[in-house]
């Protein structure tokens, strides 16, 4: 009777017609992974300094192509790719010479963001690694009247909801403070917007 499945023993016939037991030896599995589903081999790390430079420069261009980043942010990315500080600085200087990275442009773009006050911009520029001198120079270009109007516009849109709070003025102050506006901007905005929405009108 045939036996299903793998058998630990096989048989063969002798020259005289008898049956001799033969131990079954399973095939050894290859330690080499199958080609199907096999992971792609990792690319070899560039060996020469020039190859490393070209690879790091290409990575810098990709990083700068995604979004405008500061020198400090780009340096951090490059340092995670290369352990050669001289090579990192060389690549940084190169992308700056070509005009692909400029901290002043990044600061100006951040300063033009609408809906945030001077304090938020200052905090963001510091977090992104810009120097104190550049931050001060950037913030001096802000228009105080424009900042005041932005605070008023934000509060006007939000006032119907804020007016239903237990203390509308305190809620309005917190709302604008979270967006980086200072007290000298917030209080005038609250007074002006509160006059636009009388209590009976705000409740409707």
Curated annotation (Swiss-Prot):
Chain intervals with Basic and acidic residues compositional bias: 39-51
Keywords: Cytoplasm
Region (Disordered): 1-51
Compartment(s): Cytoplasm
Gene3D superfamilies: Winged helix-like DNA-binding domain superfamily/Winged helix DNA-binding domain
Matches recorded under InterPro entries: RecX_HTH_3rd, Regulatory_RecX, WH-like_DNA-bd_sf
Function: Modulates RecA activity.
Family in the record: Belongs to the RecX family.
Protein name (Swiss-Prot/TrEMBL): Regulatory protein RecX
